């Protein structure tokens, strides 16, 4: 009987040629910008390292990373927290190197955020159970930080877009904060009137705003919330975890105007003082973002650039409304060429929005 043929490749045999990569669309639309191929080259990648400090309230110079002691009101109508009791979003804009010498070309380069490595800094500081914290036993260690915690970060080519949702629409927030305007009972659920852009650090209370899932096409955000009275904080430390920022088309956030935006909130729980009062405890977050150059179709024609340059030189006035739903403009007339003097001055002839000549009497 003939020996059976040995299965598998023979030693020393040439390796099989790998399959060709799957073809994907090269041209996609992203936020109104037509994305072309990725520019190759050694200098096409860059890394940005930064960190964001927490904005818990910082009630005094000795309590950075903590909020002011919290106090729960008995009545919904009496709720009026201080600014120092409200943890707020941390945000920063990172200016990137200018990579376009000529903005009048048909194609330009934009920075594209590809990956991010991030972690919370200072986790081991919460092992301090001997500094001003309430004792768990008469002669024991202090009570560890515990309670509701929220960890969130975002990386984008534009500021994070927010949706407002309130737990109590009757709460009176301090003037130094940005909260949903004209709050009603509908503000305690989805109300599309409450939209905002995270454009200021330490101004948007976390309890009032969440990332808007219907927007943020040019931003990637990640977050987890764990609620409860005695919930311990669970945090991981590693420099090997990488979060990919590309979408299903293989495109990451495109940094408009050479600007990269990072946002974060890291509320680890409640610190219990010796007196029994409690404060929110927050920690800073580290970012390491990798960017590459992406060739895109120039979305800014030369006429737009010139118009923008001229408009920037115009004095801005915060005056009464002359456009929009509340416009105070009554009528606009445009005259062209000349005609014989009409015998009836009340007879008005004009071209309507459909291009038709119309005559009407006053």
Swiss-Prot record:
One of the GO BP terms on file: symbiont-mediated perturbation of host cell endomembrane system
Per the UniProt entry, the effect of residue 161 to K/R is:
95% loss of infectivity ex vivo
Record's SUPFAM superfamilies? Answer: Group I dsDNA viruses
Q: Which Pfam families does the record match to this protein?
A: Polyoma_coat
* Residue numbers bearing the Phosphothreonine modification: 338
Reported effect, residue 49 to A: 99% loss of infectivity ex vivo
Motif mapping: Bipartite nuclear localization signal: 5-19
Q: What does this protein do?
A: Forms an icosahedral capsid with a T=7 symmetry and a 40 nm diameter. The capsid is composed of 72 pentamers linked to each other by disulfide bonds and associated with VP2 or VP3 proteins. Binds to N-glycolylneuraminic analog of the ganglioside GM1 on the cell surface to provide virion attachment to target cell. Once attached, the virion is internalized by caveolin-mediated endocytosis and traffics to the endoplasmic reticulum. Inside the endoplasmic reticulum, the protein folding machinery isomerizes VP1 interpentamer disulfide bonds, thereby triggering initial uncoating.
Q: Which family does it belong to?
A: Belongs to the polyomaviruses coat protein VP1 family.
Q: What is this protein called?
A: Major capsid protein VP1
Species per Swiss-Prot/TrEMBL record: Simian virus 40
């Amino acid at each position: 009987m003939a020996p059976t043929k040995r299965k598998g490749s023979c030693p020393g045999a040439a390796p099989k040629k790998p399959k060709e990569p799957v073809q994907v669309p090269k041209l996609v639309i992203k936020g109104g910008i037509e994305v072309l191929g990725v520019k190759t080259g050694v200098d096409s990648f860059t890394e940005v390292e930064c960190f964001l400090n927490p904005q818990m309230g910082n009630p005094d110079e000795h309590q950075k990373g903590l909020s002011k002691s919290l106090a729960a009101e008995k009545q919904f109508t009496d709720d009026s927290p201080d600014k120092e009791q409200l943890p707020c979003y941390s945000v920063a804009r990172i200016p990137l190197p200018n990579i376009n010498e000529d903005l009048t070309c048909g194609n330009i380069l934009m920075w594209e955020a590809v990956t991010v490595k991030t972690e919370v800094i200072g986790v081991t500081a919460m092992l301090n159970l001997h500094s001003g914290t309430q004792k768990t036993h008469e002669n024991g260690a202090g009570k560890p930080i515990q309670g509701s915690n929220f960890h969130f970060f975002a990386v984008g080519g534009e500021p994070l877009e927010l949706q407002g949702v309130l737990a109590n629409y009757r709460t009176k927030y301090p003037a130094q904060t940005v909260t949903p305007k004209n709050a009603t009972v509908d503000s305690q659920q989805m109300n599309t009137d409450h939209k905002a852009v995270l454009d200021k650090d330490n101004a948007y209370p976390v309890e009032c705003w969440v990332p808007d899932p219907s927007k943020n096409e040019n931003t990637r955000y990640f977050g987890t919330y764990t609620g409860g009275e005695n919930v311990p904080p669970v945090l991981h430390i590693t420099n090997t975890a990488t979060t990919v920022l590309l979408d299903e088309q293989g495109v990451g956030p495109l940094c408009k105007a050479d600007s990269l935006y990072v946002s974060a909130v890291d509320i680890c729980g409640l610190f219990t003082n010796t007196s029994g009062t409690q404060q929110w405890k927050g920690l800073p977050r580290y970012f390491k973002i990798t960017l590459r150059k992406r060739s895109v179709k120039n979305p800014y024609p030369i006429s737009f650039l010139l118009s923008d340059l001229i408009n920037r030189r115009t004095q801005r006035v915060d005056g009464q409304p002359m456009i929009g739903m509340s416009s105070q403009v009554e009528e606009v007339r445009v005259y062209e060429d000349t005609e014989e003097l009409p015998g009836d001055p009340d007879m008005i002839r004009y071209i309507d929005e459909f291009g038709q000549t119309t005559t009407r009497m006053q």
